[in-house]
Amino acid sequence: MRPAFIRGKWLSRTLELATGLGRRTCSSRESGREVRVRFAPSPTGFLHLGGLRTALYNYLFAKKHGGAFILRLEDTDRSRLVPGAAESIEDMLEWAGIPPDESPRHGGPCGPYEQSKRLDLYHVAAQALLDSGAAYRCFCTPQRLELLKREAMRNRQTPRYDNRCRHLTPKQVEEKLSRNSPFVIRFFLQEGAQPFQDLVYGWTQHDVASVEGDPVILKGDGFPTYHLANVVDDHHMCVSHVLRGAEWLISTAKHLLLYQALGWQPPQFAHLPLLLNKDGSKLSKRQGDIFIQHYVHSGYLSDALLDLITNCGSGFTENQMGRTVDTLIQQYELGKTSTHSALLDLDKLPEFNRIHLTRWIEGTETRVQLVGQLQVLLKDTYKDLELDEKHIERILLLRKGHLCRLTDLLSPEYSYLWVRPSVTREQLQCLTSEASKVKNLVVRLLQENDSGFTLETLNGELRKQLKQVKDTKYSSAMKLLRVALSGQEHGPSVAEMLLSLGRQESIVRLQNALPD
């Protein structure tokens, strides 16, 4: 969408539309009664670990203070938008258990929540800055800007705009507009920026005018840059606190100058230290395992991923394993956030997931969810398999504490749970000459018990019964039974295998492996 101009002015219809949007501005910040925070990713890619961490800390802060968590999509870089990314970002937040209160999907009082649908607001703000002299039109061509960059590089200087168009006279501007010369709008950076207090980094000051040229705030296609858009949107959405990555700390001075030029009260800022790999290197999208979708498809629980992310950072009195989102909300304190980068050790994720999966298996409602998920996984892997929910639930309870992921049950070592192994009589008889006697003792034990065993009582009964086998060590008898039941020499205890398979299936397998 290209903005409409009449000799450099926005069309009056645009002003009317924007004024209507402006009326939706919330008033809670002025009253000081409501905390409102936002997570504002760009759908130029899918949600990654760094983004999830920023979203999580915003969510925790909002819920800790009874406030609102907003999802806003910064989709103004139209050339880099990735199809499906916008929808996926919100999907991943919902999967993680930190759903936004206001978003493109759910709406809200301060929408729309995509920047591409809020252009009128940016146009009005840009015009206000032009009218007050806080911004100006820049007619410099891309070729001239490239020459400036090359010259700076040649002199080993940081490239910066030389603010040339800042000094154009009104007559010169009028002449260029009359020729329909393309332009962008730049913000007039004032020297001597005032210090501000960041809620994490403390008092900070960056005189951006001394190191940067005047920044572009509205591009030639009518879309804003981040600097203008985030200020306008945070104001109109009445954001009370901005929690974002530390990479934006230096730019905050620039944003505060924009707030001042527009006559708006700024929110409070808290910049979160970067999330890095455990060796201190930057998280890279080339790693493959940086995207949240990877962990969803790999069978990890969202609780485990959030738990790991908060354990590697700060914001809590102490680190603990096994914390749920509700616990994180209770324990989170923004003031305890460190300025040191957070080192993420993804090698610990399986152990975090084991702890949370154990808790899910113990919970009645969450166990039902796991049973349903496992049924779907089994159906995809074993097309003709028919298992009742009670059978699957029994397996989960028996394997509680041993599984790192639900998908572990689809690995070859657990295949015996779902398909009968191929075992020959010769394989078993080479383990002991009393193979048939061992089998008959265990089959009779299973047939004669109607009340059911626990793992402990079955272990005791097996040991008692197998004392009748005089020439076979107990360990050899266990190995024989394990191979007959599973086709494997190693794995869970024989008692657990018998309980997992159930009485009838266990008897069938033993008799098939060692027919009379």
From Swiss-Prot:
Organism this protein belongs to: Xenopus tropicalis
Subcellular location field: Mitochondrion matrix
Coiled coil location: none
Main location: mitochondrion
One GO-annotated biological process of the protein: glutamyl-tRNA aminoacylation
Family matches, as Gene3D superfamilies: 1.10.10.350, HUPs (3.40.50.620)
Enzyme class: ligase
Stretch forming the transit peptide: 1-39
Keyword Protein biosynthesis: yes
Family: Belongs to the class-I aminoacyl-tRNA synthetase family. Glutamate--tRNA ligase type 1 subfamily.
Any single GO CC term annotated in Swiss-Prot or TrEMBL for this entry: mitochondrial matrix
Keyword flag Aminoacyl-tRNA synthetase: yes
Motif ('KMSKS' region): 282-286
Positions with a binding annotation for L-glutamate: R38, F39, A40, E74, Y226, H227, L228, A229, N230, R244
One family name in Pfam for this protein: tRNA-synt_1c
Record field: catalytic activity: tRNA(Glx) + L-glutamate + ATP = L-glutamyl-tRNA(Glx) + AMP + diphosphate; tRNA(Glu) + L-glutamate + ATP = L-glutamyl-tRNA(Glu) + AMP + diphosphate; tRNA(Gln) + L-glutamate + ATP = L-glutamyl-tRNA(Gln) + AMP + diphosphate
Role noted for this protein: Non-discriminating glutamyl-tRNA synthetase that catalyzes aminoacylation of both mitochondrial tRNA(Glu) and tRNA(Gln) and participates in RNA aminoacylation for mitochondrial protein translation. Attachs glutamate to tRNA(Glu) or tRNA(Gln) in a two-step reaction: glutamate is first activated by ATP to form Glu-AMP and then transferred to the acceptor end of tRNA(Glu) or tRNA(Gln).
Positions bound to ATP: H48, E247, K282, L283, S284, K285, R286
Name of the protein this chain belongs to: Nondiscriminating glutamyl-tRNA synthetase EARS2, mitochondrial
E.C. code: 6.1.1.24, 6.1.1.17
GO MF terms, alphabetically ordered: ATP binding; glutamate-tRNA ligase activity; glutamate-tRNA(Gln) ligase activity; tRNA binding; zinc ion binding
Assigned keywords, A-Z: Aminoacyl-tRNA synthetase, ATP-binding, Ligase, Mitochondrion, Nucleotide-binding, Protein biosynthesis, RNA-binding, Transit peptide
Motif 'HIGH' region, residue numbers: 43-51
